């Protein structure tokens, strides 16, 4: 279903997940769409790990996304939802946009379809879900935006389309993931078993020894 949503996009792809890991066929599809259908806008919203955003979206994957032709990337600290849609279908699911989850985990979700044909009914779950996540996206921290501004019709094709880039990576993403910040947040591994004497247990949250 996620595959169908990405492949079937004609105007927009909206990807919401706390964690992104770009590998495999889904990344290839997005690369292909960016090249073959550059007018399709791609919105990406990720979250969690404010002190170290690279745990949610690596720098390599961020750079891959930045290479796409029509892309808007934003960050919401408290994001935990997973939502994927194009202009006519949406998937609310437990699935992170992560290579391991996509290929190994047992996941579930609900598919919603646009009810544009039924303009009378008050029960329009696709539109309500889309509006909610769009509002969440617009309120989120901008990381990177690249869009294309069409040349004026009065230039008679003599002026190329203008690519507009708004890059906040260095002030937002980099600031949160610099070496000093990583050093502050680095924790020593917690031992759950020792080789000498009696075995000891430790709390996985605090690392305190459990008698």
What are the language-model segments listed below?
Residues 2-68, 183-189, 195-199, 209-211:
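Primarily the HKD phosphodiesterase
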Residues 92-196:
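Signature of lipid phosphatidyltransferase scaffolds
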Residues 1, 24, 36, 40-129:
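HKD-type phospholipase D/PLD-like phosphodiesterase module
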Residues 204:
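Cys/His/Pro-rich metal-binding microdomains
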């Amino acid at each position: 279903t996620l595959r169908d949503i990405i492949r079937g996009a004609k105007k927009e792809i909206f990807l919401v997940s706390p964690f992104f890991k770009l590998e495999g066929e889904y990344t290839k599809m997005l690369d292909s769409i960016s090249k073959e259908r550059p007018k399709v806008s791609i919105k990406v919203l990720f979250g969690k790990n404010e002190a170290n955003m690279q745990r949610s979206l690596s720098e390599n994957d961020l750079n891959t996304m930045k290479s796409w032709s029509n892309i808007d990337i934003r960050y919401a600290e408290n994001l935990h939802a997973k939502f994927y849609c194009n202009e006519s279908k949406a998937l609310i699911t437990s699935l992170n946009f992560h290579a391991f989850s996509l290929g190994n985990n047992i996941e579930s979700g609900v598919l919603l379809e646009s009810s544009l044909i039924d303009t009378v009914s008050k029960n329009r779950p696709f539109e309500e879900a889309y509006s909610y996540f769009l509002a969440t996206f617009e309120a989120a921290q901008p990381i990177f935006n690249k869009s294309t501004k069409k040349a004026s019709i009065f230039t008679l094709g003599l002026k190329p389309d203008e690519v507009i880039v708004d890059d906040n990576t260095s002030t937002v993403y980099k600031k949160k993931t610099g070496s000093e910040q990583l050093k502050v947040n680095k924790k020593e591994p917690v031992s759950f078993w020792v080789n000498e004497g009696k075995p000891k247990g430790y709390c996985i949250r605090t690392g305190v020894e459990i008698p």
